[in-house]
Amino acid sequence: SFFTDADQQRLVAAIQAAERNTSGEIRVHVEQTCPAPDPLERAKEVFAMLHMHETVQQNGVLFYLTLDDRKFALLGDRGIDAVVPPGFWNATRDAMRDHLHAGRLVDGLVEGIQRAGEHLKAYFPYRRDDRNELSDEVSFG
């Protein structure tokens, strides 16, 4: 796989740190190439495939990335879309894009995950009774 064990551990640690701030659930899915013309459409398929829509607050966030063509998409569930302002993900996406275009894929994902945790904290603060509803492991397609 393109990501070393250390890379994957770094991503899992970033997800766990972000999820200490928010009840939002963050996942990363990586594929070699994007089978759809639009990475956002593929992200929607992956979101469903990973059962990310099954969180109690519908506040899952998927970071979708392809290695060959460096396409990526950020997708938040309905519960997030219902409460955040338009363009909520734009700053996160733009910050990631610079890293990804420079080939710093793990750095880009880590920065995106950190920002997602910070931004979601205002809308979905961490609750003491919160449980980890989705795996923190990176999934590969």
Where would I find each of the regions flagged by the language model?
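A structural boundary signal for the start of the first folded domain, especially the loop/turn
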Residues: S1-G60, L65-G141
